[in-house]
Amino acid sequence: MARPGTGGGGTRKAAIILGGASLLLAAACGGPGHDSGPAAGPAPAATQGFTATPAIPARPTATAPGPRPRPTARAWWHPGGSGPDNGPRFQWELNHPLNTHSARDMGAGAVNAAGRPAAGPTVYDIDGIENPASTVAALHRLGDKVICYIEVGAAGNYYSAASEGIPVSYYSQLAAAGDLGRKVPGYPERYVDINAASTVSVVESMIRQQCAAKGFDAVEPDIDDSYSDSTGYPVTEAENEAYDRTLSTYAHSLGLAWGQKNGDNDPAFAKALEPTTDFLLTEECSFYHTCQLVSAPYVRAGKLVLDAEYTDDWGGAVAADLGRFCAADLSAGIDGTLFTSALAGQRSPCQ
């Protein structure tokens, strides 16, 4: 998925699905899909099992970064599963830096599927580069957890080195190493060569400098399933799994939880990643009838499954749209929320 607000609404997943819908329908599975305030969110549920770890100082990244620190055993957030009145409450805002003084950005004033005022979010998923450590700290003071959105399978030239706080931008480092492949359809981004050691080093620097150093609790790794795309590099599913495991191990060594993103039409991919992954974020799995394909191993393991549905897909009134998927999500142990594809702060949660 490309970052919302960069020229196209929604996600890269939707475009992929529409092209392959007939194949998935033939398999009787439907099609898959591809991103201090006025309302203080309540403290997270005890089921989340979080043990705090201190922020890690950033280290400067050179064009050819040095060896990564050796992973060590550290505590990280283990978000519990979902269900009626259980589990974290989710806000996903990637359109712009989170404004903790904005009721919309903070997810306040939402109405749930039952037509009642929804409780405030306890988990915020925000852009790891655009948002400063002070925003993460402000959310922590409210008792909330914060997920760091980064791209691990593609790169866009969105940020300057100065905005990233490093001498040479991550995009420029990847370009200099020859690790940029074909364009991501519909977005100003290029796939990266996930089999290159230089790519791993740059992405690990991003995890360390943007997520760990700013005090985030977890990482949302976008485009973590590029084996299914035409990237310009030969990549097998097994190689993609190994890449994702390498990154999750590194994140854990820094005290960060790690999520799975995408891969919604490949249950084998989800099954392979679940043992080293702490939560799952799907997009449009209810709309495309693919939730069970990917969520089953996470639900069985008691891990959090988040389903982001989009008003652009369902096209009706919010209450009617929630009524079409929330009951199924909740009964399956999935935490569903309806967003606009711009991911600009509006949210309508199932519970």
What are these regions (language model features)?
Residues G30-G33:
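Bacterial signal peptide processing site
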Residues P4, G37-P38, G333-T337:
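Extracellular/mature segments of secreted proteins
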Residues I56, A64-Q351:
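Glycan-processing catalytic domains of CAZymes
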Residues P4, K13-A14, D35, G49, ...:
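Positively charged, low-complexity intrinsically disordered regions
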Residues M1-A21:
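N-terminal export and membrane-targeting signals
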Residues P44-A64:
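Extracellular mucin-like PTS domains
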Residues D35-P44:
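N-terminal hydrophobic targeting segments that direct proteins to the cell envelope
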Residues L25-A28:
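C-terminal motif of bacterial Sec signal peptides marking the signal peptidase cleavage site
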